[in-house]
């Protein structure tokens, strides 16, 4: 599709990397360089494509409710890669889940809001274990 990186086009890679975040400034030059490097590594790209194809072939919707363990979902409220309605669906399907929203956050909450992300994880672990 149109979201697959054009490997040699660094500005395209920058644009797509920025789209992952609510705040495009999180996509630093260093991060864009790393994504560009990954996009130009044939072996890595083939593995990523394999994972993507597997995810498409194996819809987990029927298996997710079988997960009985306590589950902490952390979602960027402005995630455009995996939109918030997917978080709501996962939350409904996971019988022992809690859904935590991080406002002003896109797809990669652990990078965009690492402190808040860590606080949520630590609180979940303290409450559950």
What kind of region is each of these model predictions?
Residues 96-129:
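Catalytic active-site module of serine/aspartate enzymes centered on a nucleophile-bearing elbow/loop
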Residues 80-86:
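Conserved alpha/beta-hydrolase "acid-adjacent" motif
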Residues 7-66:
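Conserved alpha/beta-hydrolase catalytic His-Asp/Glu region
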Residues 65-68, 93-94:
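Short, conserved loop/helix-junction motifs that constitute active-site signature segments
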Residues 67, 73-75, 79:
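Short beta-strand/loop motif that positions the catalytic acidic residue
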Residues 88-97:
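Active-site-adjacent alpha-helix of alpha/beta-hydrolase-fold enzymes
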Residues 62, 85, 112-115:
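Generic recognition of short, well-ordered alpha-helical segments
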